[in-house]
């Protein structure tokens, strides 16, 4: 009887979890306030340069420890944080994007939104809002949008991630001084599986070799964006 009761409770709990409705991220509170406060404290202690190359987004950027070396000679500010959603990159942009008056922004975020259950249209709309606010305050800024990774651990979400990347690329086609970089060609094999050594054991985040591969496809776009803004930032 105890075994039967245990099984019934387990089934009930599983069913409740499966049927639990997704709460849209736009209706959820912003997380990781401590990370943002830490960035602000670091800025107070050692003010970063204005008109730099700003990286903003989620953990793929946060974990890129040698991004400054890979992106030389440009001055780099890395403000990737946690496993952030686009709601948070947008919600905190007054604190960790706009104060820097960046010359070029490298933006990668959105995959976590989709993995959480938000439809593709939701992060795409937030990215459009982010871009509009950025350009209102900093009209000469260029943006390099980085595709979300089709990581092996998220294989079930690949079709949605592919659609997200297509729509992200469309944003770039519609605007000026925008670039789109598909890092999946650097990280993954033609069949979609990760190249040997590209990912950590979690099959989600890039390993050191993966970051080298990302840099090889990202740096040319950063070079082009920096050159395109040369005249605007000479004044």
Located regions from the model:
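Acidic/histidine-rich helix-loop elements
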Residues: 20-22, 26-28, 73-87, 115, ...
């Amino acid at each position: 009887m105890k075994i039967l009761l245990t099984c019934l409770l387990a089934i009930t709990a599983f069913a409740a979890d499966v049927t639990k409705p997704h709460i849209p991220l736009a209706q959820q509170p912003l997380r990781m306030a401590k990370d943002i406060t830490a960035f602000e404290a670091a800025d107070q202690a050692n003010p970063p340069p204005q008109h730099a190359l700003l990286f903003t987004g989620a953990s793929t950027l946060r974990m890129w420890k040698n991004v400054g070396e890979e992106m030389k000679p440009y001055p780099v500010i890395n403000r990737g944080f946690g496993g952030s959603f686009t709601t948070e990159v947008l919600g905190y942009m007054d604190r960790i994007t706009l104060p820097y008056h960046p010359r070029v922004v490298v933006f990668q975020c959105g995959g976590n939104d989709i993995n959480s259950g938000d439809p593709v249209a939701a992060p795409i709309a937030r990215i459009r809002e982010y871009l509009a606010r950025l350009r209102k305050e900093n009209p000469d800024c260029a943006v390099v949008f980085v595709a979300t990774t089709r990581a092996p651990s998220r294989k079930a979400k690949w079709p949605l991630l592919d659609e997200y990347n297509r729509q992200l690329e469309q944003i770039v086609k519609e605007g000026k001084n925008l670039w789109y970089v598909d890092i999946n060609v650097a990280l993954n094999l033609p069949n979609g599986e990760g190249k040997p050594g590209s990912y950590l054991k979690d099959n989600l985040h890039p390993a050191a070799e993966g970051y080298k591969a990302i840099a090889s496809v990202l740096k040319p776009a950063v070079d082009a964006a920096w050159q395109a803004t040369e005249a605007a930032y000479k004044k």
